[in-house]
Design a protein with these regions (language model features):
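Cytoplasmic juxtamembrane regions at transmembrane-helix boundaries
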Residues: 72-94
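Alpha-helical transmembrane segments of multi-pass integral membrane proteins
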Residues: 105-156
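Active-site and channel-lining beta-strand-loop segments
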Residues: 22-53
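Alpha-helical transmembrane segments
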Residues: 11-13, 46-63, 127-136
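Single-pass alpha-helical transmembrane signal-anchor segments
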Residues: 12-22
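Alpha-helical transmembrane segments and their helix-start/interface "positive-inside/aromatic belt" motifs
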Residues: 1-14, 88-91
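Select subsegments of transmembrane alpha-helices in polytopic membrane proteins
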Residues: 7-8, 65-69, 91-103
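Membrane-water interface of transmembrane alpha-helices
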Residues: 24-28, 61-77, 143-149
Length: 156
């Protein structure tokens, strides 16, 4: 199986876990749950427990969006190096970028529910590590793009 296929399956599995965990925990949630956190992970916004469905819905939308993008590597909406415009490469890049996004959604949902259940008091620093992974993926694409641009200029 190709790398992009494996990444797609892992991302799809994470989406199923996000929905399953939310469904399992929903009935036991208090009527008001944390919905927003400040930079330090402390709660600065709350809403009714129905708002817990927002993050799984956004994660699902992002999954469909990334899947659609991976199917059209020539899209003018993609700002990627020409070397990424092959279907296999764009799939690896897009699904590599989606992976930390899905992990981030899962972490925020799990931690929000744990805070609502009073099992922890604030978000952990895991969010920052996950964002770091996402920036590494973006940075890798950027470095490849810059190198490709320099090679094209030297060939002209």
């Amino acid at each position: 199986m190709k790398t992009s296929g494996i990444l797609f399956i892992v991302n799809a599995f994470l989406l199923v876990v996000i929905w399953s965990f939310t469904v399992m925990k929903y009935a036991g949630l208090p009527d008001v749950i944390p919905t927003h956190f400040d930079f330090n992970g402390k709660i600065d916004g709350q809403a009714g427990k129905d708002s817990i469905w927002t993050l799984p819905c956004i994660a699902t939308f992002i999954s469909f969006l990334f899947f659609a993008i991976s199917k059209n590597p020539q899209s003018s909406l993609l700002n990627v190096p020409d070397s990424f415009r092959e279907k296999q490469k764009i799939g690896v890049y897009i699904f590599s970028l989606q992976l930390p996004v899905m992990i981030l959604f899962l972490d925020i949902i799990v931690e929000s529910i744990r805070i609502a259940e009073r099992k922890q008091t604030e978000l952990s620093n895991a969010v920052f590590y996950i964002l770091g992974i996402m920036f590494v993926v973006i940075g890798t694409g950027l470095v490849i793009s810059i190198r490709e641009g320099k090679i094209k200029k030297s060939d002209q």
